[in-house]
Amino acid sequence: MGIKVYKPTTNGRRNMTSLDFAEITTSTPEKSLLVSLKSKAGRNNNGRITVRHQGGGHKRHYRLIDFKRNKDGVEAVVKTIEYDPNRTANIALVHYTDGVKAYIIAPKGLEVGQRIVSGPDADIKVGNALPLANIPVGTVVHNIELKPGKGGELVRAAGASAQVLGQEGKYVLVRLQSGEVRMILGTCRATIGTVGNEQQSLVNIGKAGRSRWKGVRPTVRGSVMNPNDHPHGGGEGKAPVGRKAPSTPWGKPALGLKTRNKKAKSDKLIVRRRNEK
């Protein structure tokens, strides 16, 4: 999928880019796989803002994605490649030979008419899903499970990929995009290939309005707020923070504080941290 560049006919168009959607084959989703989505605008059941900078935007339907890929031995044909407003990756509509329809994350190189299959005996081919123990060393994968049968949780964003490095007993070593090397059970499934639509990260929004269409509201700096709204607020003119370190709106340390639980049980499964050389 290529990048479309606009002429600077207005200030908002200057430097604006978008995807050309050349890979998209239809604009009409499969109705049986749609679920309504209610806009929460970042509020909880009490009406209080729990997630800032959310609200407005275009209405969306949620597409039911098959992250489990557990129909072993049943072949499926790719019917369409579609846009999904709920994620950066594109999705593919597949029709199984037993009549079931499903959406999957569209990997790079997947084409309409291509046949895919899941199961331990599946070929090492883009779009096929297998247990990690059955995938050769060096293979690039995505949509990786953390618990067998739960469905893919890792490596699902556009352009993301991970690589199988080896096997240690019942675990398989996988290098994630961040550089982290992690042990994952060999019975967990993964899909062959890299997630498609990798150029979406190169898009220049161009104007604030495009963010509002996506439901993203403005981010206001704490230093321009009043002191009752933010610890950085108040003062005359461009005043400094006035604290030893920058703070969140709720007075917690910001910028650099580690938030991971020091007693996380999954620590023993991380062979190499993402920030280690």
UniProtKB/Swiss-Prot annotation:
The protein's role, per its UniProt record: One of the primary rRNA binding proteins. Required for association of the 30S and 50S subunits to form the 70S ribosome, for tRNA binding and peptide bond formation. It has been suggested to have peptidyltransferase activity; this is somewhat controversial. Makes several contacts with the 16S rRNA in the 70S ribosome.
Alphabetized InterPro entries for the sequence: NA-bd_OB-fold, Rib_uL2_dom2, Ribosomal_uL2, Ribosomal_uL2_bac/org-type, Ribosomal_uL2_C, Ribosomal_uL2_CS, Ribosomal_uL2_dom3, Ribosomal_uL2_RNA-bd_dom
GO molecular function: rRNA binding; structural constituent of ribosome; transferase activity
UniProt cross-references to PANTHER family, sorted A to Z: LARGE RIBOSOMAL SUBUNIT PROTEIN UL2M, RIBOSOMAL PROTEIN L2
Self-association state and partner proteins as the record states: Part of the 50S ribosomal subunit. Forms a bridge to the 30S subunit in the 70S ribosome.
Family: Belongs to the universal ribosomal protein uL2 family.
Record flagged with keyword NAD: no
Name of the gene encoding the protein in the UniProt record: rplB
Any one Gene Ontology BP term: cytoplasmic translation
Ribonucleoprotein listed as a keyword: yes
Keyword line: Ribonucleoprotein, Ribosomal protein, RNA-binding, rRNA-binding
Gene Ontology CC: large ribosomal subunit
The protein, known as: Large ribosomal subunit protein uL2
Stretches for region Disordered: 218-277
Compositionally biased residues, Basic and acidic residues: 264-277
